[in-house]
């Protein structure tokens, strides 16, 4: 069998690579490697000109494998794979060597070592490329319907957007009513619109839409399957129900921290949260006299290091509403996070209406004590550079949004991750900001992280668009990088099933393991743990990895 003809394309990436790696020397070295028929350098291999040069070289030199030495495959591999296919080379006969992130950027002060390392990485990539095999991507049918878990604003907007495109949607909401946390708001920032003016028309559209089915007082109990074919089990008002959908959207929202034990909350009825103040404002029951608000009550701490993002805006909005009722208002803050032009204007409006802002230091938080004639708030404020004592008739705590109580249970059911704070975590913050690593499942709203209504709705429309793509196509192609079980060697021990994080392996009628192609992500955990060596990882076979390892040990 003749060795495949390999082409190597080394990218200068402007100065990102060329300033630290001797690219011409690397190209000349690549030409000496076994199987390499052609090698060249490009200023930007990912540019239209660079891609056209790859296609021209494939045709002119009858190349059968392609290696690009440039930046990260995470961002650019799909682009180069498409280029290879356009020139008649199977996309799985392509290999990348990351000589930017893993070489030039690491060794900016060592150009000679950077050049030698670039040669090593290319030698390894060429060794693997020589053993690559074409891959076929299986297609699977997609059920053109969606499940939205959560009936808050983001869940309802996502459901409406999908339903308006002609797809059936089921909303599963655990509470008695749709609306989520917005039900507890009196008005919305930054335009002080009544929450009911937003919520009531939205709920009416959802409940009367012919394509949307709403199940309240319902929870998801089981999820099995893969993109295009998820089997859902729910408990709907005490009754079990099962149905099938093609995509899933997680929009379970978040909860507001109940800060018991913090600043006398739960001990003195004059201490309430911003959410509780909203309800008092709606009922017209705000105490007369002086109102003091404390920001970051329970957030930006060791236990919850994140900023909840909406707290400052909510506090400023409520401070304005309280000031308009003739109350004196103080806002005690660490850093006032009224981001964006509208919220900044809201802050300026609050100052014009007499709201006073005093900064406090994180290491010296306010001290609150109670007496029959009022609350006393003591702090050192760098704003006035002295200790301050305020008598308060009412103390308002700005508490953060926290993950819902059943987030962990749902994440395990869906096989999707949570971040260190307990919120649902996207596949990639820049490249796939609303997708999970598990295909066909998406996240939006405060289930993902604390955010305002505008951002939640933007994410909801984004996930609706993403979820609609496979449903509109009716079929999806899965990657050929997956595991394959040699059932003549499989002992049926089930170790691979136990370790697979995606539930992508099951036992067949003979009790032997088999891969579910649509679910497998090619992570390789099963292949690494199989005691019988019965599992092959396509595109990352033992032979290919060993060839790379041996190439790494060769002298450049």
Where are these regions (language model features)?
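Mid-to-C-terminal Rossmann-like scaffold of FAD/NAD(P)H-dependent oxidoreductases
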Residues: 2-6, 152-155, 334-373, 450, ...
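Flanking helices and flexible, charged tails adjoining ferredoxin-like Fe-S electron-transfer domains
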Residues: 2-6, 183-208, 212, 236, ...
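Beta1-alpha1 glycine-rich phosphate/pyrophosphate-binding loop at the start
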Residues: 2-63, 67-68, 72-103, 144, ...
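Cysteine-centered iron-sulfur cluster-binding motifs in ferredoxin-type domains/subunits
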Residues: 10-20, 115, 119, 148-163, ...
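Rossmann-like dinucleotide/flavin-binding elements
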Residues: 49, 59-61, 104-109, 114-122, ...
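Iron-sulfur cluster-binding cysteine motifs and their immediate structural context
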Residues: 71-74, 163-177, 211-216, 225-231, ...
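Ferredoxin-like iron-sulfur electron-transfer modules
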Residues: 133-149, 153-154, 183-194, 226-241, ...
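A Rossmann-like FAD-binding core segment of flavoenzymes
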Residues: 193, 199-255, 320-406, 507-508
